[in-house]
């Protein structure tokens, strides 16, 4: 505030690494009108089984109705796997129901927000692309922030593999299988 106030940024950035006892990996970019979401574990549903959540009767009934096929598309969304990318117009779709990733009218905003996401994870050297246990073992004697800025964390290689694997493209399988032989895998 005052003379030390920083200028407003074009985007804010979000991070999800876990949901209680479940691991998930989501990054997001939010602007004045749109939110871009990149799911790095799209094979997992939004609604993974979290013990505390399933103690509530409402959640139990909701999941049972989903399993029985009694919900509409919007009601079922939480229990389904995620798309690799999501883009929502927060002005016209506050509930984030209509994913605009495939919309021709939104190609430019998608590219802009995707680039902002990629720039951000590279700028901060996002350590979230390592499992928690690996972050701790590589950071012994230092902090994850400091470890990320050493050769203990080959970020570009790890990020490339994570981005490719989570993209769910069949063409990536051959390349990804060679990564299994990497000395750091």
Regions of interest found by a model, annotated:
Residues 1-6, 22-25, 138-142:
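Short, solvent-exposed polar/charged micro-motifs at secondary-structure junctions
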């Amino acid at each position: 505030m005052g003379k030390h106030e920083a200028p407003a940024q074009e985007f804010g950035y979000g991070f999800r690494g876990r949901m209680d006892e479940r691991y998930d990996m989501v990054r997001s970019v939010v602007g004045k009108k749109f939110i871009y979401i990149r799911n790095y574990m799209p094979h997992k549903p939004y609604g993974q089984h979290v013990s505390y959540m399933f103690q509530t009767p409402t959640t139990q009934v909701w999941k049972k109705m989903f399993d029985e096929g009694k919900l509409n598309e919007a009601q079922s969304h939480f229990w389904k796997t995620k798309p690799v990318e999501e883009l929502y117009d927060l002005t016209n779709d506050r509930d984030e129901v209509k994913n605009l990733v495939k919309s021709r009218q939104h190609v430019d905003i998608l590219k802009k927000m995707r680039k902002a996401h990629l720039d951000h994870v590279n700028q901060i050297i996002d350590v979230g692309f390592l499992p928690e246990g690996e972050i701790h073992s590589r950071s012994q004697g230092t902090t994850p922030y400091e470890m990320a800025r050493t050769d203990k964390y080959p970020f570009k290689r790890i990020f490339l593999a994570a981005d490719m694997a989570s993209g769910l493209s069949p063409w990536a399988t051959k390349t990804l299988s060679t990564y299994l032989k990497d000395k750091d895998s």
